[in-house]
């Protein structure tokens, strides 16, 4: 039976509240302390080796120099579902999306071992790639507890403009999940049209390296410092 909108919203609040108040060991560090710190990066471009990939590579190379491992998952070019608000991920306590025919749950499986996250996307009409938004929204609903409280950053790549709006759109889910946003010397933006052209954006590449160093520093700083205990989410609506 399909979950009503009110039931779905209440379930979301309950899951978020639980994640916010549960012990850190359950969600933020579901691995041994002596393992190497790791950042999970998601390439949201339909071009596997385009400018988004080039920006993420700059981040990965810098993280490696700082002693932090990384893994990049490409969302690919196959159709990706959007969230249909069925609520089964929550009502059945699945911890994953009920639909298992695209990359969403493959990413979910990687969340627990990640100490930080980086999302990268090209800019389409001032927004991130729709496929990335679709998959990440489902992941946040189904497995947001495994993202909760971990450092996160987003990268927007564009030919000319619209990247700041895309950048903000990608940041917003992390802001709802109590994730410290990793900043840089500028917004995490790179410019380029043809594949690889972003490498010529000297300031953009420097921005990626600075963000990566900040990410490594923050992950290491938080390793043995659990977040504060959070109050349960007091969810209200404009219409009762």
Where are these regions (language model features)?
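N-terminal secretory signal peptides and thylakoid transit peptides that target proteins
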Residues: 1-15
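C-terminal segment of N-terminal export signals and the immediately downstream linker at the start
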Residues: 23-49
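Helix-loop-strand module that forms the ligand-binding subsite of alpha/beta enzymes
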Residues: 37, 98-186
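A short, Lys/Arg-enriched amphipathic alpha-helix followed by its capping loop at the start of a domain
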Residues: 58-68
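A short beta-strand-loop structural module common to alpha/beta enzyme folds
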Residues: 69-78
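Cysteine-cluster motifs in flexible loop/terminal segments that predominantly coordinate metals
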Residues: 78-111
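Glycine-rich phosphate/pyrophosphate-binding loop and the adjoining helix
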Residues: 180-240
């Amino acid at each position: 039976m399909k979950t009503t909108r009110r039931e779905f919203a209440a379930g979301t609040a309950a899951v978020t509240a639980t994640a916010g108040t549960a012990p850190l060991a359950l969600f933020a560090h579901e691995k041994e302390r002596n393992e190497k710190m790791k950042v999970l990066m998601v390439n949201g471009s339909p071009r596997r080796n385009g400018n988004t990939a080039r920006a993420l590579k700059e981040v990965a190379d810098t993280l490696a120099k700082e002693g932090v491992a990384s893994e990049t998952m490409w969302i690919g070019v196959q159709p990706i579902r959007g969230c249909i608000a069925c609520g089964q991920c929550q009502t059945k306590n699945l911890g994953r999306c009920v639909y298992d025919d695209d990359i969403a749950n493959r990413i979910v499986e990687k969340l627990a071992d990640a100490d930080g996250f980086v999302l990268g996307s090209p800019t389409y009409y001032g927004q991130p790639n729709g496929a990335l938004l679709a998959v990440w929204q489902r992941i946040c609903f189904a497995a947001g507890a495994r993202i909760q409280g971990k450092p996160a950053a987003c990268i927007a790549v564009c030919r000319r403009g619209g990247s700041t709006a895309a950048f903000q759109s990608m940041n917003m889910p992390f802001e709802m999940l109590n994730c410290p946003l990793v900043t840089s010397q500028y917004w995490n933006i790179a410019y380029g049209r043809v594949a690889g052209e972003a490498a010529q954006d000297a300031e953009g590449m420097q921005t990626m390296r600075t963000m990566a160093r900040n990410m490594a520093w923050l992950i290491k700083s938080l390793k043995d410092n659990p977040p504060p205990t959070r109050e349960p989410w007091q969810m209200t609506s404009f219409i009762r």
